[in-house]
Regions:
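Mixed-charge, Lys/Arg-rich low-complexity intrinsically disordered regions
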Residues: 1-9
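Short beta-strand-centered aromatic/proline hotspots
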Residues: 21-30
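Short aromatic-glycine-enriched beta-strand elements
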Residues: 34-38
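Intrinsically disordered, low-complexity, charged/polar segments
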Residues: 41-68
């Protein structure tokens, strides 16, 4: 399972879904309540935010990480 502490700006996140969308991490902020990421879909160039609150593991549909 992916640890949130492993995610850095510039990393590529690969979603755990049918098309395996790839997202580049543009910003990363860690707070006590959650981790917040600003990401960009590399195929569509759509930018969105991602908040993960479940302890220190990413359980938001992202399967693996590829370091840039």
């Amino acid at each position: 399972m992916l640890k949130l502490s492993d995610i850095k700006v510039g990393d590529i996140l690969i979603a755990d879904n049918i098309d395996g969308s790839e997202y580049k991490v543009l910003e990363a902020e860690r707070r006590e309540d959650a981790c917040y990421f600003y990401i960009e879909n590399l195929k569509t160039r759509v930018r969105s935010s991602l908040r993960i609150r479940d302890g220190n593991e990413a359980r938001s549909g992202i399967a693996k990480i590829v370091h840039a």
